Each structure stands twice: as structure tokens, then as C-alpha cells.
């Protein structure tokens, strides 16, 4: 069990201390994350305008929406690896610079094929989340990991919400062009990437960080963990098969084309497995010092936790407005208002989850409390029916949303403590599983009633609680002034790797 070495932890008012280097770094980083999410979600608010201007059908736009998330899951892992190898500053700038081009390409595309390809490439911009987590972990002490990560992720996630609010206004009122509205968002992101390159460092000036030895795959500590890592890696690419199945069933692509995509998915899985073996066999043959070992099940607990928090959040956001409209006979506007509660609460409750994690006696106990709240919250939501008072239904949804989004905060409060030099890798795995969870939940929803859907998520959260209760370890030094470094970290920092 970890004990505190200093009770002076970061609080809400510290966010206004702009003279402190770490606070300035936090604000610069959440803004970078914010812009990547603004660009990632810059199509959805303009769907009706795009259809009217281009003559595309709603089904064609739905395929574009699937392309918009298709590569996010596997690229989050790849970008996490890159973070650990070259640092989050360079990685963030690479993401912002490179993703600006498919954004602008999509804006001025002259054919549907161009729109498909550009949107597919642009789905990788969703990796900005992983880079922000890695950068924040370098600037803040272990005792402040939860709150700082929660603030960065909470504010950054608002990029999608602000895109929904501002882009229609910009496209229809200010610019009179959906193409320029989307293109300018990419240009702004590119410009901010250039600013970010000069405005920040990987942690406080003068500090050194241990780098991962290889960028191709996550490092493990035992042969058993290598098998575990392979099993946990397969779904990250394999989940894309569900997206292919969806577009095939809706006749968006032919069966013959789907076979090609399935073959590419299998090839991607095999590549990831071979990369894990190639990176880790030499390390394991040489032997891993005891102070450098970690259990891969620790990564697994965070992956499953993010499935039932962020994955559930994305899945529920997609159906909640219609749920309110159907159950309580609300207008689309009112249903949308109540259905947006998950997104609106994101900053406050996610930061609150991290804040609670920083202040409890153990981070594991804080996390388990939130997981129990997620399970209980969705069970209560499954009981909502037309006989309920609307106010009570809204209260239940708000409570559930507080636990779900707060659970995102307690999950990433644990990420930096798995193994210091692979924080980006761990964030990539957890982030990828969050998106994969959303794909699985939304696919399952097509076979379930609303109540069954909520019960399924609640049951999955309950199983995750049990999994974490038995297999999650309280990290050493979770409230310390500095992160613990292993003998291998020290050797790498000295240039001996």
C-alpha cells in the first residue's frame, strides 16, 4: 500500500497559477489535444450541409463516419509507442502537422473516393489523447497525476463538443462554406503544432526521461506476460472486423471487398504479434532485473476499465437523445439537451475522478469505488421507464455520467505508474480499448433493447470491478514527490542501452 509523503497536492485554484511552468505546460497541452478532437469531429455537425452541397446520400455519409473512427484504435497504440521513443512534444507536433493535410484534402475533395481516403487517414488524429496523457505525466509529480491527467483529458475532450456548437455557425454564417470551415480547423491545428514545437519541452527544462528501448512494441517482463500481451493486442486490430461487418451488412461495400479488408486485418494482427515477439525475446533471454519488472495484467485492468468508462460513454452518447425522446415523448431539442449530459460533465467529473484518486489512501480503492458506481449507475438506468418522473430519470443519468466520466479520470491516474518509460504505450493500449469498447457496445446495441443495453454495460462494469479487485496492484510511490526509476531506466538515461 502506498502512503503519502506530502499532503500538498494540486487543487482547482492551481489551474489559475499561470506563472508556474507545469501549469503553463498543462494548458498548452490540453489545447493541443482540444484541437485534434475539434478536427476529428469536424464533419458530424455539417452532415446536412455536406449532403445538400455535394448530393451525397445519408448512407454515404454514414460510411464516412465509420471511416472517421476506423484507424483510431490501432494508431493509438502505435502513437503511444512513438511517444515513449521520441517524446510527446515531437509526437504531438507530428500528429498535428500530418493530420492537417487529410483534413484540408477532405475539405476540398472533388470525389467521394477522395473523401473516403482522406477521412480514413484523418481517423488517426484521435491519437492526440494518448500524446496529451504522456506529456502531462512528464510535467507533474506522482501525487498530482490524477488531477492533472483529468483536467488535460477533460478539457481536451471538449473539442468535440465545441466543434458541434461552432462549426455550423462558421460554415453557414461567417464563411458561407462548409469546406472552408473544415479546412480552417486543419490550418489552425497545423499552426498550433508549430507553436507547440517551440513552446514546450518534454518535462521541466533540465530533466531527463527514460526512453523505451524499441518503438515497435510494448516491453514485457516475463514469458507469460509476452503471451498475455499478445492476447491483449489481438483485439486492438481485430475489432476492425466489426466495422467491416457493419458496412458489409448495410451493403455499403461488397462481400468481395470485405474479404480484402478482413485479410488486411489479419495481416495487421500478425504484424503486431511478430513485433511483440521481435522486441521482447532478446530482452527476456537477457533477463529482466526484479526492480524493472511489472505484470501485464496491470495494463489489462486499465484496458478493461477504459472499456466500461470511456467506451460506455461513447456508446451511450450515440443513443441517449433518442432514448429520452422515445421513452418520455420529448422534442428532439429537449431530448438532445438531456442526452448531452455525459459530454457536458466530462471536464468537471473527469477531473474530479483524478482529484479523488490523488486524495484517497490508495488509488486502487478510488478506482474500485468508481467502477462500482458505473455498474450500479447502468443497472439503475436499465430500470428507467415511461412511468418514471422525468426529473428522477435525469438525476439517475447524471449520477451514472459522473461515475462513468470520473472513472476515466481514476483509470488514467494509474497509467503513469505501470512502468515509467512505457507510459505512452500503456496510455495507447488503454485508449485503444476505450474506442474498441465503444465499437463493441454500439454493435451489440443493434441486437438489444435499451434496457438490455444498459444492463450489458452494467454487467461488464461489474465483471471489470471483480477483475480489478483481484488483479490490480496498488502502484508503488503513487503519492510520492518523484517517480520511481528502475536500474534499467537509470542505465538508459545514462546512455547505456
Regions found by a protein language model. Name each.
Residues 85-96, 358-372:
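Cytoplasmic membrane-interface "Motif A"-like loop-to-helix N-cap segments
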Residues 63-80, 340-353:
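Central cavity-lining transmembrane alpha-helices of secondary-active solute carriers
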Residues 97-110, 372-387:
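C-terminal ends and interior cores of transmembrane alpha-helices
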Residues 118-155:
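Cytoplasmic helix-loop-helix junction between adjacent transmembrane helices
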Residues 146-168, 428-441:
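Glycine-rich segments within core transmembrane alpha-helices of 12-TM secondary carriers
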Residues 152, 156-266:
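Helix-loop-helix hairpin linking two adjacent transmembrane segments in secondary transporters
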Residues 74-113:
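Conserved MFS/SLC helix-loop-helix module at the cytosolic interface between two early adjacent transmembrane helices
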